[in-house]
Amino acid sequence: MAITALYEETRKLQSLHNAEVVMCSVPGDPPFLKYAWFKNDNYILDLESVLKRCGHLNHLLLHIPDYRVNRLVEWLSASQALLKNIEELHLNVLAFNIDLMQGQNVTGLEQFGSVTCTTAHQAYSNLTTREAVGVATHSLLICKGAEFYSPTGYEDKEQLLVVSPDAHPFKELVLQQIARELPGLRIQVIAGLTYDEFASLIRRAKWSLTFGEGLDGFFVEPVFSGSISFAVFNERFFTPAFADLETVYPSWDILLERIVEDIRRLDEPMAYNQGWQQAYDLLSQHLDTNRFRENLRSFYRGEYTFP
């Protein structure tokens, strides 16, 4: 959904960048027409077909997902005939997950044109990342802020714990312990849901537990929907302030030791609302839609955070 947000907000800035905006599948990936798991009117085009149809271009900017950089280096190397029709090529790497940048040859893109990198998390929007990727880097911080959600209160919540689908060595152990010690709590691992079904589920769920990167949709969206989310602190994605949240643990061992008792302790209106509000306020400051939009405008003006 982050790519969709980037696409839709970029279209709104046409008066700034003066360009047509299309969304394309990554060359070599299986073709598909649109994202089917959430409502949208955005169709996915074939990049090679688009470029052939365009003919001569004064300028082309390609936003490239972090995990597909090497694929694009190969594709661009084999597509020299298409590139001859482009006067100026700008390649921007979308660093949605800093861990997925490992092994990706970002500077290898420089043989084709100018290269930049945009970051999605504040935790790695820094000079260290700029030096690691070797190209100008900009804090984009794509997000869907709190204003897009309608949180439900404690009294409207069900005894339901939603769990991210991520694989993790502690997952089975943690879930078995919760199920054994809290038999009245229903546990649902997210799988096979549309986005609307997921959104409905987290509005009903009291609790959420992510085994992913930490500051991800399985942590953020439940909080914005009125739930309390549990995670283990991951310095690569969380900023230090999140370590102060009572449901963000310093390690998986400590989560395993405390989570059952914390669920029991928080399962009454006053404690629940206090714990939820603490996380909600921090996330609302951290994930600001207007800041993302201003960051996007700065990017298209060529005003980068770490030039």
Summary of predicted features, one role per range:
Residues 30-113:
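Extended catalytic core of nucleotide-activated donor transferases of GT-like folds
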Residues 100-108, 113-135:
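A short, active-site helix/loop in glycosyltransferases that binds the activated sugar's phosphate group
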Residues 217-287:
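Catalytic binding pocket for nucleotide-activated donors in carbohydrate/polymer assembly enzymes
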